Regions:
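Short Gly/Thr/Asp-enriched flexible loops that form oxyanion-binding sites at enzyme active sites
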Residues: 71-83
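Short acidic, glycine/serine/threonine-rich loops at helix termini
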Residues: 7-11, 48-50, 74-76, 103, ...
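Flexible glycine/proline-rich
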Residues: 81-112, 118-120, 124-251
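Phosphate-binding glycine-rich loops and their immediate beta-loop-alpha structural context
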Residues: 1-64
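Short glycine-rich anion-binding loops that position phosphate/pyrophosphate groups of nucleotides
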Residues: 2-3, 67-70, 143
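Residue-level "edge-of-site" marker
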Residues: 41, 69, 93
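Thr-Gly-centered strand-to-loop micro-motif
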Residues: 7, 38, 64-66, 89, ...
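Catalytic-core segments of thiol-dependent peptidases
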Residues: 60-69, 84
Length: 251
C-alpha cells in the first residue's frame, strides 16, 4: 500500500508503519520455513501483478497483508482472480473478516476456474510436485495488526504445517473457566485475546486483555492465548468454560 512506511522513515499524515511484515517474518521463522521478503508493494495493479508472478515462481506459498477489503486501492483479490483463483474471501470471524485464500498460477499455467478442485476444497494445502509446478497458494491477510496475527495462527500456520507434512497441524484447544463476562453475538467466530492462568484449585482460568480492537497491538502483547468463541455461541458468563488456543511458545 502507498500508506505504508518502513522503519526509520519520518511519519506523515495518513501513513502507518510496516509492523505486519516483521510480525509475519517472526512467525514464519519460528516455523522453520525459508522466508523470501519481497518488501512493500505500492497500490498499483501492474506492480502487484509483477510481484505475484515473481513470488509464484520462487515460493510454495505467498502471504500478503492488506489490500483484500473493498477499498478503491484494494487490488489483491482482483489480482488473485486474474492470475489464479480465489478459494474463499470474507470469513464470519472477528478479527480477520476480509481474509482471502486462493492460488496464483506460475508462468505457463492457466488460471483455474471457480469450479476447480482447489476452489471446491480449500483445505487441500498438501504440497506436492503437481501443485508446486502450477503455482503457489496465496494467503491474503487483513491489514490490521491483530487481525494479521489471528488469521495467521488460525489459518496460515496450520496450512503451512500441512504443506510441510505434519499430520496434526490444527492448533490444540484447551478448556478454561472465564473469570469475566464476555459479550458475544451468535453468527460469527470471535478470537478474543486472553491471559490464561492457573486457579487456586489447579484449574485453568482465562480473562480478556481489555480492548479487543483489531488495531490494538497491546491486546496481543499482554495475551498468551486466544479465547475462541464459536460461531453458535452467545454471551459468556463468569464461570462458563470456553475454548482457548494457547500460543505461548508460538509467538
Amino acid at each position: 500500500g502507498d500508506e505504508i512506511l518502513s522503519l526509520g522513515e519520518p511519519p506523515r499524515e495518513g501513513a502507518v508503519y510496516d509492523s505486519n511484515r516483521y510480525t509475519v517474518f517472526g512467525l514464519l521463522t519460528r516455523l522453520g520455513v525459508e522466508v523470501i521478503d519481497l518488501g512493500v508493494v505500492r497500490d498499483e495493479p501492474a506492480l502487484l501483478e509483477a510481484a505475484f508472478r515473481d513470488a509464484a515462481q520462487r515460493a510454495d506459498a505467498i502471504i500478503t497483508s492488506g489490500g483484500v477489503s473493498v477499498g478503491e486501492a484494494d487490488h489483491t483479490r482482483t489480482m488473485m482472480k486474474q492470475l489464479g483463483d480465489v478459494a474463499f474471501w470474507r470469513i464470519a470471524m472477528r478479527p480477520g473478516r476480509p481474509m482471502a485464500v486462493g492460488r496464483i498460477a506460475s508462468a505457463g499455467f492457466q488460471a483455474k476456474s471457480a469450479s476447480s478442485p482447489y476452489a471446491e476444497s480449500a483445505s487441500s494445502y498438501q504440497n506436492n510436485t503437481a501443485s508446486a509446478a502450477s503455482g503457489a497458494v496465496l494467503f491474503g491477510l487483513p491489514g490490521n495488526p491483530v487481525a494479521v496475527m489471528v488469521t495467521f495462527l488460525a489459518f496460515v500456520r496450520p496450512a503451512l504445517l500441512r504443506m510441510m507434512g505434519c499430520t496434526r497441524a490444527a492448533p490444540p484447544l484447551l478448556r478454561a473457566v472465564s473469570t469475566e463476562a464476555i459479550r458475544k453475538k451468535p453468527g460469527r467466530t470471535e478470537y478474543q485475546r486472553g491471559t490464561v492462568t492457573t486457579g487456586p484449585d489447579g484449574s485453568l482460568q482465562v480473562r480478556t486483555t481489555g480492548n479487543q480492537g483489531s488495531g490494538v497491538l497491546s491486546s496481543m502483547v499482554q495475551a498468551n492465548g486466544l479465547i475462541v468463541l464459536h460461531h453458535h455461541q452467545g454471551n459468556v458468563a463468569v464461570g462458563d468454560a470456553v475454548d482457548v488456543m494457547v500460543f505461548e511458545g508460538v509467538i
